[in-house]
Amino acid sequence: AYQDITIPFQLSSVEFFTEVQRHLKPNGVMVVNLNMTSAENGSINEYLCDTMASVFKYTVTAPVKGNTNTEVFCTDADDWEETFLRSIGNLTDCDYADMMRTVHEKLTPYEGGACILTDDKAPVEVLGMRVLDELIGDELKYYKDELKTGGLSALLGG
C-alpha cells in the first residue's frame, strides 16, 4: 500500500477506517499488519488500535512470532470467532490450518482507549519515529551489553 517507514496519515484516521467499514460485507473483517510494534503508552500502535476500536465493534490483536509485527483484526460481526474457527476447519492445507490455529490461540481482545487519530490530527510520522527510535535503542543495548561483558572479540565473533 505504501513504501514509507510510517503509515500515511490518510490511511490511519477514524474517517479512513469508517470508509473501510462501509465497504465490508456484513460479517467482513479488516486485517491490518502493524510493523514496528511497541508496547509503550502513547505509541503509534496504541493510537492505531484505539482508532480502529473506536470504529469497529470487535478489535483483536495477535503478535507475529519472530519479528516486530502485530496483526489486528477488526469486525462488527458478533459471531466472528465462531466463523474464524469454522473457516479453519474448512481449510484443506494442513500447514495453513495449523498456522491459523496458532493465530487463533494468540488472539487478544483489544479494549479501545482515547488515543484517536483523525483526518485533522494524525501525527503518524512522529509516533512512527518514536517506535523506530525504541527499536534502535533495543538493538544498541544488545551490542553495548556484549561489548561490556565480552569485549570487542565478543562483537567480532571471536
Predicted regions, residues:
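Conserved Class I S-adenosyl-L-methionine
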Residues: F17-T18, G42-P63
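Soluble small-group transferase modules, centered on the S-adenosyl donor enzyme superfamily
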Residues: Y58-G158
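An acidic- and aromatic-residue-enriched active-site/binding cleft used to recognize and process polar
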Residues: A1, N35, V64
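A mature extracytoplasmic/lumenal domain signature
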Residues: L34-M36, D78
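A short glycine-rich, Lys/Arg-flanked "PGG" loop and its adjoining helix->strand segment in the class I
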Residues: S12-P26
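Conserved beta-strand signature within the Rossmann-like core of class I S-adenosyl-L-methionine
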Residues: N27-L34
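A short SAM/SAH-binding and catalytic strip from SAM-dependent methyltransferases
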Residues: A1-L11, S38
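Non-membrane alpha-helical structural segments and their capping/turn regions in soluble enzymes
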Residues: Q10, V14, G42, E46, ...
